[in-house]
Amino acid sequence: MVLHSHQLTYAGIAFALCLHHLISAIEVPLDSNIQSELPQPPTITKQSVKDYIVDPRDNIFIECEAKGNPVPTFSWTRNGKFFNVAKDPKVSMRRRSGTLVIDFHGGGRPDDYEGEYQCFARNDYGTALSSKIHLQVSRSPLWPKEKVDVIEVDEGAPLSLQCNPPPGLPPPVIFWMSSSMEPIHQDKRVSQGQNGDLYFSNVMLQDAQTDYSCNARFHFTHTIQQKNPYTLKVKTKKPHNETSLRNHTDMYSARGVTETTPSFMYPYGTSSSQMVLRGVDLLLECIASGVPAPDIMWYKKGGELPAGKTKLENFNKALRISNVSEEDSGEYFCLASNKMGSIRHTISVRVKAAPYWLDEPQNLILAPGEDGRLVCRANGNPKPSIQWLVNGEPIEGSPPNPSREVAGDTIVFRDTQIGSSAVYQCNASNEHGYLLANAFVSVLDVPPRILAPRNQLIKVIQYNRTRLDCPFFGSPIPTLRWFKNGQGNMLDGGNYKAHENGSLEMSMARKEDQGIYTCVATNILGKVEAQVRLEVKDPTRIVRGPEDQVVKRGSMPRLHCRVKHDPTLKLTVTWLKDDAPLYIGNRMKKEDDGLTIYGVAEKDQGDYTCVASTELDKDSAKAYLTVLAIPANRLRDLPKERPDRPRDLELSDLAERSVKLTWIPGDDNNSPITDYIVQFEEDRFQPGTWHNHSRYPGNVNSALLSLSPYVNYQFRVIAVNDVGSSLPSMPSERYQTSGARPEINPTGVQGAGTQKNNMEITWTPLNATQAYGPNLRYIVRWRRRDPRGSWYNETVKAPRHVVWNTPIYVPYEIKVQAENDFGRAPEPETYIGYSGEDYPKAAPTDVRIRVLNSTAIALTWTRVHLDTIQGQLKEYRAYFWRDSSLLKNLWVSKKRQYVSFPGDRNRGIVSRLFPYSNYKLEMVVTNGRGDGPRSEVKEFPTPEGVPSSPRYLRIRQPNLESINLEWDHPEHPNGVLTGYNLRYQASCLSSPVNGSKTGRTLVENFSPNQTRFTVQRTDPISRYRFFLRARTQVGDGEVIVEESPALLNEATPTPASTWLPPPTTELTPAATIATTTTTATPTTETPPTEIPTTAIPTTTTTTTTTAASTVASTTTTAERAAAATTKQELATNGSSIWDIRAWANSNWANITWSHNYSAGTDFVVKYITSNKTEKSIPVKAQTPSSVQLANLTPGMVYKLWVFPIWSSPSEHSYITFTTSSAYTKNHVDIATQGWFIGLMCAIALLVLILLIVCFIKRSRGGKYPVRDNKDEHLNPEDKNVEDGSFDYRSLESDEDNKPLPNSQTSLDGTIKQQESDDSLVDYGEGGEGQFNEDGSFIGQYTVKKDKEETEGNESSEATSPVNAIYSLA
């Protein structure tokens, strides 16, 4: 065997044997086999402490453990007398142990067992004793009752409050608190002494604000006892003034307290003495009084305080010296001082000592005829006396032994013989304590033994120091010699050094030191030898290690690590990065002589360490790798695309089960290739279908592919980067592998019946890479699940086989084995299947129904017997249907429903029933075939419930003062309706920032027959939210919620012209089209045109370009036009976006656009407000492309971009639009304003003057060229001009399009004036005047002028008197 770490253990044993040999003693090695064979006197291994205090509430355990051969027996003495354990039923002794157990569970007083116990362990070779164990029961006596009077004390006087705690075992811990259980604050003026008393150096007036109670905490019982509290009454010369005390620099003089020099309260006088035992802690204490409170300092006469052992405690009033020794004796003094003076107290410290060991006697093992000695030296103060015992008895009273001589603290043995074994006790004692030690003397004669394993193999690296170990044992102690290769010369000297512990050391192992070494151990009883084979190995060295490198990101650095090592040792090469194990991922490749990193990144920078190790040694080499990052500005503007396809696939290294595939990578298109996917296609099972074969890092261009037998392979490669996957490469040439027998069998084998007399066996067939050969087929075997049954088999090619004429639902054992022309697959697994099921023969009985609530019932039934199921029980089913409603004339659906209760159970719950209805129910049991017979039909009613919501709630606003509500009854009343409950509340828009304000909730209750209600508005701008519920006597039903329509004066968004410019024409990026329509009559808001949109949950802002005209009307409504651009910048592939349009209202906008990108392209809509608030909204692919932007800011100007999600917007390709202003209550009727009435009167007067001038000119015979346009009129119903230069949209009502009063329509559509041609009645009415005779020119002129203006502005306005006046002007 090979010995490495064990060498140290054996060397330690051999060294111990050698040491004891020098003092004529033998140490028995820690070998269980040897120790079990050698006789050994008893030795105490575990015992309780000398002063043993126990808890009276627990059982008592007094420990005593010992070892020896034979196993010792135990006995006890109590108070010096034999303690008979067998006579006391409460006392027992543990098996193979001397530990006493005193059990009080059955009663008894622990105090009765107090005393001094000692344990005796005996065997054939002697008796060992434990120390005397003083057993005491813990006590926590009560505090003596006493009356504590009020203590009167002058302010500034000293005071001590005595505690006098009851004596406990062990002594209690003392602390002071008030009666309200608050700790007493302690400082250098007020502190607790070592005796538990509370000392006041001087009393202050605030000391009387609390009382003082001494508390004692007892450790074992975990109890706290409290003394009656002290109450102080402080007599003072001046009344208490807190303000003056805070402002005064000396509170004592401020209070009129006389300042005094210090005096000692404890200890008294100027000197005292204290005795302490060696090894314990010494605590010296000085407490002084005085005004102000004095400071305490400590000194030692004639020297410094012991360094490293002293500690000041209790505000310097106590000095603790740890682990006192004789050197700490002397005089210590404490100095108490304040500004009035100082005083000193001297404490004389005397250190005594209980006995302590100088030389504790040790076990002595001797050979027959050898000499030895036991030494027992102890010290103490006073000096202890030494007493020897043998086997527990005084040595003076033991039988005489001529080979033994007692000389004070030493026993000398000469010429010992077999049979002289015994256990000796040494007792060292003085007035402060005692020590007891056991040491046995054992006389052994043992032939030599080699303790090391036989035929060891030691491997060592050349030129290293090594040592061959040969631990041995014997009595007398044997002598040991070393030989090499059976030569007679003893090895000692030169390169070899033999140690007495049996080790042979070589200062430098060389190749010629290899060989077989023999160690021979000899004593008078015999001789024994063992062989050790030494092999010298070559060292492990890194001949070429990694070097520091500086590389660019994305490159492929290689770190070298070439190792030379002994070929007979296994080499392991590991890599560390920054002194931590390196994880070798798919970007790294570890080889025998180095490490390659593909696509190195900044995170790869650091220290790399190559560690080459064998079982004997190791070597390492380190290098630092620096990675230079490519500047970001070099790649930022480069467009990233999917990589180009790999090309030029080539097959090489053709082998039976592998092939090497090589390819040339395509362009990565500015995104590094991260992976290559190799796919294959075969032409036998699934021709034309490609399967993934393997995946490789993006920095390789070849791969060794593992192949399956009998597959005609064809390969292709796909490159992958962060953008996506490339197109597949062109396929490689085909490669056919040879065949073999299948190695696996089909999986997923199942057996189940499709009819009651068959079983269909199915499985997952082998694929092309698993067939391994031609003519793949399957051997199907089956038999009844009976070890004695016969197997049936069938060979098939399809992945199924049907077995007929089977009993109903019996288990079968099934095996399916694959086979081809090269042979069969290994023996298949056995699966369990079942033949077909038949319908169950019995129905559940004793079906009972308990109604839980209006929609649920609880069912119980008696289960069917398992023999009647004829298959696997799947579930119990409860079929139920609604037979009728308890409401008259209410039609109900009688559709049958069922609830399943899986498994073998007899109870369940049916829920989701309609309340207030009659139901019928029947039950069946179901297996895999279907339902069994039905049980008896049960009928039950459901109680009344709450109704569903009303079918609808319609809201109409006939005017600004009221809202009409109309609703319908609930579809499911679920009981007798008792009425309706309507809750509603108003909300008005306060500001774009603060949102809406909600008013209080109003409640209305209606009878069950009422379905209409009118709400009177409190103001015309509020919107209302309505909550309507129907009600039965059970309670309110489901709610229907509706909100009143939008405000009446909000603009109605209407799309602008749908005209698209030619594709070759591009507008400026901010080009917009705006149309304005002016109406002369009030209009009612209409819903916006429905456009397919994507809901946007976030708050956004948009605007649109508008134009408006002011006319003489009661209400003016501005219609928003669509902002549009014909085309954005072209993408790299020629695709583009055009015709971006925005239909905007005050707080939302519909956005549409056209594009020729591929289907499935997602877009981003980005918009920025005039105050630079930016939002981006992703839009999923849809047709047509549109999105709705909600929660915009009224009156805000927006810039908007649309671009593909994988792209970024062009800086100039945007449109702008503006949202309309919000409605305010400051709108007034313009027709009632004084300035407007005055303006209209002035215009009428001006028209009259102009008409008079015209008539005067006519009367003078002027002629005008108006005959050609005599019958032409610009009617609001006229169509657009044919060139499509503008689009006219009228918002006028039908009344506006009718002929004016006193007019008629001609056959050609013109309007003929019936009255006088120069009549101005129509103008007085605000209508359109017409002059149709030759002298009538105003209408013709006005129409022509309006037409010209309309064509120039690409907008249309209704003809009005204002236009006519402007035309004439």
UniProtKB/Swiss-Prot annotation:
Topology Extracellular: residue spans: 26-1235
Gene3D superfamilies: Immunoglobulins (2.60.40.10)
Fibronectin type-III domain span: 645-740, 745-838, 843-945, 949-1057, 1133-1222
Post-translational modification (record): N-glycosylated and O-glycosylated.
Residue spans of biased composition, Polar residues class: 730-739, 1300-1313
Region (Disordered) location: 730-753, 1078-1097, 1266-1369
Keyword Zinc (UniProt): no
InterPro entries noted in UniProt: FN3_dom, FN3_sf, Ig-like_dom, Ig-like_dom_sf, Ig-like_fold, Ig_I-set, Ig_sub, Ig_sub2
Disulfide linkage: C64-C119, C163-C214, C286-C334, C376-C426, C470-C519, C561-C610
A Pfam family the protein falls into: I-set
Residue ranges, compositional bias (Basic and acidic residues): 1266-1282, 1289-1298
UniProt signal peptide: 1-25
Homology family: Belongs to the immunoglobulin superfamily. L1/neurofascin/NgCAM family.
Function as written in the Swiss-Prot or TrEMBL entry: Cell adhesion, ankyrin-binding protein which may be involved in neurite extension, axonal guidance, synaptogenesis, myelination and neuron-glial cell interactions.
Name of the protein in question: Neurofascin
Organism lineage string: Eukaryota, Metazoa, Chordata, Craniata, Vertebrata
Gene: NFASC
